[in-house]
Regions:
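Charged catalytic carboxylate motif
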Residues: 6, 38, 42, 167, ...
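Charged, glycine-rich active-site and insertion segments that engage polyanionic ligands
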Residues: 52-55, 61-167, 171-242
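A generic secondary-structure signal
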Residues: 13-17, 46, 93-94, 163
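Catalytic acidic motif of RecA-like/P-loop NTPases
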Residues: 30-36, 41-48, 64
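Conserved catalytic/switch belt of AAA+ P-loop NTPases
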Residues: 16, 41-58
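Conserved adenine-binding aromatic site and its adjacent loop/helix in ATP-hydrolyzing domains
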Residues: 13, 45, 68, 72
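Clamp-loader machinery-focused feature within the broader ASCE/P-loop NTPase space
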Residues: 1-38, 200
Length: 242
């Protein structure tokens, strides 16, 4: 999260210092939806009467989390996401990634090139990728105690739960896609084709729909501050049964 001290230290305490070499002083708050209510209130005092040279960008994918007083004092500029193919092309050309890696980063970025670049350089994301691959490949044979241990490990390693849900949504999307089309080229996780093929053969359409619905329910529960371990346990049990 972005706390009140972050806003005070990085914006409020420095905005009065005039720029030296340009007419504007620009602040960019990435993932601004992570600002706490206290942080938003601290920023509000600044954006009500900013210096004429100051420009503050609040970058977000979810404006609904902002206080109405923040939204009313901002000009909203809506940017369309890039196509996955455009993000992938950039990653291949500029970061020299393997095509299979670029497919995964482009999917997770959801049209946000900056996020794709960050994910490609993130060790935390590589850990998440490894952990989640193990889970989806072995879930059917794991007993309840192993599932609970896995959930606790996610919590201890402070892995991004929303990205975990994204991973599972993309994975089972691939399973369903391959079950319908039998086209490897349509997969996000192309390198995992053998496992995806195996799961698609043993899972029915109704079961896969139940799994995807359970992921959506987990998102809703986490957003409503339901206990994290309970939300994931309920989801994983549905996945195991289907």
């Amino acid at each position: 999260s972005i706390g009140v001290d972050d806003i005070r230290r990085q914006i409020n305490d420095t905005i009065a210092i005039r720029p030296y070499s340009s007419p504007y002083k620009v602040y960019i708050v990435d993932e601004a939806e992570k600002m706490t209510v206290q942080a938003q209130n601290a920023l509000l005092k600044t954006i009500e009467e900013p210096p004429s040279y100051a420009v503050i960008f609040l970058l977000t994918t979810n404006q609904d989390v902002f206080l109405p007083t923040i939204l009313s004092r901002c000009v909203q500029i809506k940017l369309k996401p890039l196509k996955d193919s455009q993000v992938k092309e950039y990653l291949l050309e500029h970061l020299q990634l393997k095509e299979a890696e670029a497919d995964v980063y482009a999917a997770f970025a959801r049209g946000n090139l900056g996020k794709a670049i960050r994910l490609a350089a993130s060790e935390d994301f590589k850990i998440l990728h490894t952990e989640m691959l193990y889970l989806v490949k072995n879930l059917k044979t794991m007993d309840i105690s192993e599932i609970l241990m896995f959930i606790r490990r996610l919590k201890e390693e402070d892995i991004d739960l929303l990205e975990c849900l994204d991973f599972m949504q993309f994975w089972y999307r691939d399973v369903l896609m391959f079950k319908v089309t039998k086209d490897v080229n349509l997969l996000i996780f192309k390198e995992e084709y053998p496992s995806i093929n195996e799961i698609s053969q043993r899972s029915g359409y109704e079961g896969l729909e139940n799994i995807l619905a359970s992921i959506d329910k987990a998102r809703i529960r986490l957003a409503a501050n339901v206990n994290m371990e309970l939300a994931l346990e309920l989801m994983l049990l549905v996945m195991k049964e289907n």
